């Protein structure tokens, strides 16, 4: 059973890395640029946006008309913002 969980962790982390790299190529480092411009509060705001979306999807069971983002996609984005925040703060040391 442990190997199954470990494999799923590897798969999720690999997917996260792929998505982050793909978006970084597509949009540039907009996350860091926005944080530089508006401060560290941006780090929390991005994460809070995803938490609010999860609340609507999981607790309130609201659907977003026209949006294709699933609960799983939202969790992946949340993890992505956490990773980007970590990198941003490390680079500011």
Language-model region placement:
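Intrinsically disordered, low-complexity regulatory regions
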Residues: 1-93
């Amino acid at each position: 059973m442990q190997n199954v969980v470990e494999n799923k962790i590897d798969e999720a982390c690999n997917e996260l890395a792929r998505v982050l790299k793909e978006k970084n190529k597509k949009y540039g480092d907009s996350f860091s640029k926005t944080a530089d411009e508006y401060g560290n509060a941006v780090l929390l705001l991005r994460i809070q946006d995803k938490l609010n979306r999860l609340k609507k999807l999981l607790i309130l069971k609201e659907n977003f008309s026209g949006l294709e983002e699933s609960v799983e996609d939202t969790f992946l984005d949340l993890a992505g913002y956490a990773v980007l925040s970590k990198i941003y703060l490390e680079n500011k040391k």
